[in-house]
Amino acid sequence: MQWEGNLRKLETSAQANEHGQVAYSLRGADVLQALPPEEINAWVGERLQIHFGGQIHCRVSGQVLRKTYGEGMSYQAWSEHPAAVESVLRPELSRIHEGIALRDFEWEQKHHNQPHYVYISQTGAFKVGVTRTTNRPYRWHDQGAVAAVAIAETPYRQLAGEVEVALKEILSDKTNFRKMLANVEVDIPALEDWKEECFEHLGSVYEPFFIDESPEIFAYPVLSYPEKVKSLTLDKVPHIEGTLEGIKGQYLLFDEGRVMNVRRHSGYRVRIDVG
């Protein structure tokens, strides 16, 4: 089969597929026109060719670009678009719960003045993070977590960010993609230990927002994991060909340890040949 369009980040289903694995879809676009989703778990084990002809389109305006900013945007879009507001990366900066917008009032009301989780996930190591309650479990799929647990629920983003900042004193908020792309063994006892340590570290100030939930576990469609990761970009390698060994997080895992971050290439127009 053949697929052609502008890449967007991989999307997943809330429920695992019949094999108990995270179910992935490629939801690209024809410049700005959304394309039908293509289920891609079945691509694992197949020969894949990805051809990049040099065209990149801004995912906001459709403008032809030489380089992208903030996941497929032009510099102007990245500077002005609501989805690139600073409180996306630094939740503690949001002020929309006070009625103050940093960039776009309606967008921030819809996305940031909403209930949020603070969570711990196991990617390559254990990390703390923040996400809207409606983004569960997709956020965990995106980062390639093998397990995760929500430990607090707040009424708005800034407060979740405040909790996260406090927990960054004992936990990282970053994912090491090379460690994540290894065959990470689920460690629920360690996750539960971190949960209790976080509660203890936060203390009574944030206790009203604590929640006691069971961890969730995720399996990914991977035949074999790379022993040594070699990250590919279409700017440097415009033609990628090989056996697709798996999908984890936002990465396609090819043979010979080569990996490609699909989200990183949002806006890139490609042709994909499968089989």
Over which residues does each language-model region extend?
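Non-catalytic accessory segments flanking enzymatic or RNA/DNA-binding domains
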Residues: M1-G275
